[in-house]
Amino acid sequence: LTAVDREIVARTDRLRAAMRARRIDAFFLTRNVDVYYFTGSMQNGIAVVPVEGEPVFWVRRSVTRAEKESAFRTKPLSLRTFERELAEHMPEVFVSGRRPVLAAAFEALSAQLFMRLQEALPSAEWTDGSAVVREVRAVKSAAELAALRQSAAVADEAFREGLKSIREGIAEIDVMAVIEAQMRRRGHFGVMRMRAYNHEIPTGVVAAGESGAEPTYFDGPVAGCGFHPAMPQGASFRAIRRNEPIMVDIGCTVEGYVTDQTRTIVVGELDADLREAYGWAERIMREAEKLLRPGVPWEEPYLAAMALAERAGLSDHFMGFGADRVKFLGHGIGLEVDEWPVLAKGFAQPLEPGMVLTLEPKFVFPGRGAVGIENTYVVTKNGCEKLTLTEDRLVVLPIR
């Protein structure tokens, strides 16, 4: 077996262990990212993993490319003949007179496709397997961590180049263009994938002054105002001014894997209260880092951060402002930006070695902007390791 094949086998084995625990007979993978994770190919189709026996990737397009890429056996997909083909290739699951329990990640499955699957497989009982896939993908392998380290290195190099362009009068979008071009030349895909329905995200945000405090639909503390209501997030044409906070939040996708980082910059000098708030963001980061270790409930870093924000007298500004505050401190990240674990109240599951996640303590001040920091980490056997390479500091640039 090749290294890729061994990786796919290990992932499939973990999926099957979770299926056995839930008495699932077969798992239908439909989301492009899930299909890639388990097959090694992101061609359009449905990968079916039986609890026993050979998995098969039924491909709509392109069968030719899937045959070259997929670790699973590939077959052309036709929903008209799907039931017959499933019975032929997986008789232990799809035998006549049996009511198999089938799972799919409902959070990433269109109603239209689900209805067609129900029509094609009328005898099946369906169950939501969203949590199953999230659990399996939450713990990263050595190969995945290698891709994440490459991503972090590319982001750091691009950020350093982008920093050289920041000066009074330059537009947010021009800074973002420098950073994005530098990342693209180094292997960034140009996209970051999100699992959340109806969500999309640009490569990054450069948000200066009040742009950093502009609320929007995106489930994050700072999104930028963007160009237009049709894209209400990201950098804008607004010119950077002296003595205002500039938040640079960038994601970089290398070999499919995303890292996320944020730094706060000022040309000149920040107001004293904003400098103090930034100091609290770093303090929250340091305290939360201590809690990134195996066995700690996902919610604990969030609850500790909220307590510190309260002590600072800044709770109304923490992770957004007022009704637009988000209710998390960090998020899992990998092939998608919004993976497990979620550092938020109510998530009592324990952290495990190999989980990759962000911490992003940020404070938002309406009409003035946002300050804060974000890094990507991996949970280790004894604590955590910061994958982000960029130095943790408030970046102060001279007026020129």
Segments from the language model and where they lie:
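Active-site neighborhoods and metal-handling regions in enzymes and metal-associated proteins
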Residues: 1-400
